[in-house]
Regions:
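Small beta-barrel nucleic-acid-binding modules, primarily SNase/OB-fold domains
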Residues: 2-113
């Protein structure tokens, strides 16, 4: 069942499916902002932060952060601009995502196709 009423929910509860139409991307594993409301961190993807660092206890890939972010943007849509803060604006098709619950910072961990 697709979880509705997303605009009123900051984090999608674990186990729920939901739609995400991407509107902007921060780095190679998210967050990805969705038209439907949630910000998601893509589960199963390891990417450096934009400053080149890696989080403690997480894999630290060799790929630089900008290349990883740009690859994610191409994967989920078409870049259409950039915000003053550095978010890449995207236009892409809706993805069906499965929530893994909260990963902090009002973000939902999710696998999406």
């Amino acid at each position: 069942m697709i979880f509705s009423a997303l605009l009123a929910v900051a984090v999608i509860p674990a186990g729920h499916s939901f739609l995400c139409t991407p509107t902007r991307v921060w780095d190679g594993d998210g967050p990805v902002w969705c038209t439907e409301g949630p910000r998601i961190r893509l589960s199963g993807i390891a990417a450096k932060e934009l400053d080149g660092t890696c989080s403690d206890g997480h894999p630290c890939p060799d790929t630089d952060a900008i290349s990883a972010r740009d690859a994610l943007v191409r994967l989920i849509g078409t870049p259409i601009g950039q915000t003053r803060e550095g978010h890449i604006l995207v236009r892409g098709p809706s993805m069906v995502c499965q929530s893994g619950g909260s990963v902090g910072g009002n973000r939902t961990a999710a696998f999406c196709v």
